[in-house]
Structure formats: structure tokens, C-alpha cells
């Protein structure tokens, strides 16, 4: 470091002008060298910076291209930076080393300096390079730090992305589960709503059931109350019934309620063993009428009728044929009383009111004519025919009027046999007295024996007459009913024909019972029983035909009841005229002769009856077609019956008329039956006034026998309850035919109960016919009186039982 001191010494030495010029030249050279060195340094720095920048850009691009090689890039970048830093340093040192000789040479050349100058220049350059190197290193460190931060950031970002994907997946799963839960929630909400609705409905039903329960409770209480009231009323009614029964027992009335064929309970009143007073006062009758239609009213009515019948029978016994007018008056009273009973139907009452003017005369005529028939019977048949007309007038009353006439007989029959016995005995006594006076044939039997035997006889001819006599009745019915319609003169002719035919009919009927009596003793009961068996066979033939058309008969009866009443009135007038006309009287001998003649032809008659039974069917059909022309029927039938000695035409016509009457109206039957009744009553004159009513009853029995032909056909057939009821008075009789006839009658009564008035009319007519027939056969063998009497009795009994059915 001696250079400055030497220089100063030199300057001091060179104070001369020359010395000064040299010094200036040296300073200028130094300055020029320093300026070049600065420029070189600046260029070096710029180049290094450019290289570093390019390296940085390249590194960044590499990092962005592959994240997986990020670590490698980082390492590579760090290496590259180190290399870059090394390179410039080497380059700088090399350049510096290279430039230094050139500068030094230039400076030296320019300055002409020495080694001292070179040394000073070297020191300044080394200081500048060290400073730049330090700056470069700092920059590299900053770059490395920046790269590290970037790598950490990228790793965090990647982790965030992974976690985000996981969260998204979890979110999706949560959303699905949430939707499922929402669906389940809606389902549960719906179920809750439905359950709430069901709960409301159940609550409503519960409320309704409670309300119904309350209503049922109230109803139950009301029913309980009504039940208690009804129990109380029932007890009261029971007590009243007991009192009524006590009163009935006190008065001797016994009520037997039985079920009729139609299902209704018919109160048949049997006043057994009780004998009522002989007379009924008006007060008692009014009381009985006021009782009403109840069973008690009917019972009292029946009792009154029974008493009336008993009174009539007793009076007839007391007042014989000599007091006929008196008996007629009593019968009229009975008829009037029976016409308006409380128990009768309103139709019967109306009809009785309509026919009231005829009742008295007709009833009187019946009994009067019956008495006359008893007296005149021994005398003549022509007289019988005339009386037949009178009896026809009697039979002419309306169906309704005839109904009350017969009930008296029926009720007397119901009295248990006591009244019937009285009445029958009365009739028997009358017949005996009259027969003693007229026929000189005394009764061989006591009243009891006559009663039973006559039952046999009576019922036998009833059955026989049921077929033949009843057919005759119906024939007369058809003739008279049809003919009065056309011409009154013709009706008179018909009446004459009836008289003639009635005489023949009585002969025929006499023949039948005579035939039965011929094998046995005429006065014995055996003959009677034989009669019963014989006629029963005849009846069976005739009955089936009648059985065929009961329904038609009922309908026609109702339809023609009105017309029949008018026809009957006309017939009555004509018959009354005929009745007035005197008739020659035949002696009893003539009658017997006629009967014997008929007996000879009995076999023919029976055969003809069988033929007639077949003819009836055809005749029934013909009559159904030609009901308006009964005359033609009668003519055709008469032609068929020509074989019969006396009454062939009448028989066939009668049988055909039976069927015709079934088809036609009961009213016509009543008219014709009434005529035949009168005719037969004349023939049976010995039966007496009582016989007329009983004959009517027998006619009822005949009608019943027709309808119930099956029961009559087998006389030994078991009896129905109705038959037992009817045969109560007849069980005393030994023969079963009687009971069978009663059975048939009772059954017919029940069947005909719908038209009681019509059945009664038929019964009246048929009874009169039967009584005439019975009286005729009785005359011949000498049993005339007992047979006629007991026929009347049986007829009365049967008629009464029938009327019981009709009343029910």
C-alpha cells in the first residue's frame, strides 16, 4: 500500500507541466475502464434473469400437465434451479476471467498503467459478482417456497374434491331414503284417515243401536202394558163365559161346538133330557130374539123351536083330526115364530117377510092336508092327487119360507129323541086313530116297537124314494117350474099330470117297500129291515148321479131362487084352485089292489131303476144343455120309462129331474118338490098332520142320501160324526140302514149348509114324497099306520138334524 505515498511523492516531483499532463491522461483511462465494466455487468444480469424466467414458465407448465408427477416436477424444478444458478455463476466467472485480461490490456494500453492498476480493477469486479450471486440465491429460495405452497394447495384441493364426491353420494342416498320415508308417511296418514272414518261410522252405528234399543224398550213396555190389559180382559171374558155356562146349565141347555166340513165351528145345541115349558110367552120370545146371533141366542132359539115342535106334537095328540083347524093355527104360529129367529140369516128373514102372507096358509095347508091325507088315504088315490096339488101349493112357498117350516121338525128331532118320540108318538097315535077309523088295520106294535121298526121302514123307503121319489120330485119341479113360465094353462095341465103321476108314483114307491116286505112278514120288523136293505141298493144306483152335480145345483139354486119364488106363487094359486075342486074318493080296497098290482111289477121297476140310473147320466147332460125345456126332458124320460106299470114316466122323469134339479135351481126343486110333497102327503093321508112336517124332513134325508150315495150304498158303513149326530134319536132302532140314511142325510146337510133354505125345501118335498110312498106300502100289508107314522118320525128326526147343519 505504498502506491499512494509514492504517487504523492511523484506528484510533488512532477509539479512541472509535463508532469501534470501525464497525470490527467491516466485518470481518463481509468474512468473509461470503469464504464465498460458496468455495461458488461448489466448485460450479464439481464441474460440471467431471462433464463430464470423461462425456466420458471417451463416448470409451471409441467406442473399443470400432470398432477401425478407433481412431486417429481418439484424435485426436478429444484434441481433445475440449482443448475441454473450454477450455470450463470460459472458463466459469470468465466466471462469475468475472460474479460479481465482484455480490460486490463486495454486499460493498460490506454492508460499505460502498470500492475497496480490491474489489482484495483480485480477487487471491484469480485465485489459486484458476489452481490449478484446472493440476490439470485434469494430469488431461487423464494421460488422453491412458492412451489411448495402450490403443491400443498393442490393436495388440499384434491382431498376436498374426494370428500365432496363422498358427500354427494351420501346426499343422494339420504334423498332416496327420505322419499321412501315420505311415501310411508303418506300411507300411514291415509290409513289414519280411513280408521278415523271407520271410527266415526262405528260411533254413529252405536248411537243408532242405542236409539233403537231405547225404542224397543219403549215398545216392550207398551206391549207389556197391553198384555197385562189383555190378560185382565181375558179373565173378565172367562168369568163371563163361566157365568153364561152356568146360566145355560141352569136352564138345561148344553153347548157342543163341533167343526163343520167347511172348517167353521157350528154350534149344534142338544137340549138333552130337558123338557121345556109347553108354551112360550111373547116376552120369552122377544128375549131370545134380542140375544143376537151368538151361540146363546141360537141355543135359546133352538130351545124355543124345540118347545114349539113339542107343543105342536102334543096338541096334535090332544086335538086329533076333529081339531085340525086348531092344529093348523098352532102350526101357523110356529111357522111365524120360526120365520124370524135371531139366528136365521137376513136373507131367510127377508124371504120370510116376502112370503109371510103365504106362510100361514101354507103351513096350515101342510098339516091340514096331512091330516086329510091320513083320513082320505084309505078312501082314494085321486083325492091324493088333489091333495098333492094342495101340498104342492104348500111346497110352493119360497125357499126361505120353507126353511123355517122344516127347522121345527129338525129341532124337535135334536131334542134328544124325547121330543121326537113325543111328536112321533103323537103322529103315530093320530095315524093309529085315523087308521082305525079308516083302514081298520090296527097297529101290531107298541109305540116303542113301532118307533124303532118304523125307523127301519121309514129310512128304507127314504133311501128308495131318495132315488125314485126324489127324482120324481125333481121331475115335477122341472115340469112345474118350466111350465108356469110358459103358460098358466099349461101349468094347470102339469098339475093334473102331476096328480096322475103322483098316484102312479105312490104306487111305485109302495111297490118298492112292498117288495122288501113281501119276503118278510108285513107287520114284522124284519120286513122293515129288509125294506131298508132293498131300498139302499136302489138308492146307491140313483145316488151317484146326484153326487155328480151338487156344485152345479148350488150355483143354479142361488141363481134361480128369485124366479122360483114367482113360479111358486103361480103354482100355489093354481094348486089352491085344484085343491078346492072335489075329487072322487077311492076306498082302501082299491088302494090295496093298486098296490098289489104294483108289487107284481116290482122286479120290473127295479130293473128300470137301474136303467134309469144310467139314463140319469145322459139325462143330466141333456138337462144341463136343455134346462130351459124340462117338458121335453120329461117326455123323453117318460118314453124311456114306458116299461113301468104305473109310474114309469114319472120315475124316469123324477130321476132325470133329480139331476136336472142339481143343474137347475133349488127353487125349481122346491116347487116341484112341494108339488110332489103335496101329492105324496095325499097318498100318505094316514100319516096325519104331523106326518107332513116329518115327510119334509124325510125329503131332506133323501136329498142327503142322493148327495151322499156312497154312505147309503153300504148300510153297514161306519157312521161319520155328523151321521152320529143325526142318528142320535135313531140309534135306538136296530137296523144300520137307518143310521146310514141318517149319515147320508147329515153329510148332505153339511154340504148343503151353504144353501140351507134350498136344502130345506128339497127336504120338505122329498119327505112328503117318501111319506106317501111309505103310507102306500103300509096300507097293503097292513103296516100302513106304523110305517107312515114312523116314516114321519124318521123324516122329522132327519129333517131336524139336517136343519141343524143348515143352521150352522
UniProtKB/Swiss-Prot annotation:
Tissue specificity is: Ubiquitously expressed.
Q: Where is this gene product found?
A: Nucleus; Cytoplasm
Q: What is known of its domains?
A: The DNA-binding domain is intrinsically unstructured. The coiled coil mediates dimerization.
Q: Name one GO cellular component term.
A: cytoplasm
Which terms are listed as keywords in the entry? Acetylation, Coiled coil, Cytoplasm, DNA-binding, Isopeptide bond, Nucleus, Phosphoprotein, Repressor, Transcription, Transcription regulation, Ubl conjugation
PTM-bearing positions, type Phosphoserine: 16, 115-116, 120, 124, 555, 564, 581, 618, 638, 714, 733, 766, 768
Q: Which residues carry this modification: Phosphothreonine?
A: 676
Offer one Pfam family short name for this entry.
LRRFIP
Q: Where is the composition biased (Acidic residues)?
A: 670-683
Comp. bias intervals (Basic and acidic residues) = 41-58, 82-97, 471-499, 506-515, 603-619, 646-658, 718-734, 780-808
Cross-link Glycyl lysine isopeptide (Lys-Gly) (interchain with G-Cter in SUMO2): where in chain: 606
Q: Which family does it belong to?
A: Belongs to the LRRFIP family.
Q: What is this protein called?
A: Leucine-rich repeat flightless-interacting protein 1
Source organism (scientific name): Homo sapiens (Human)
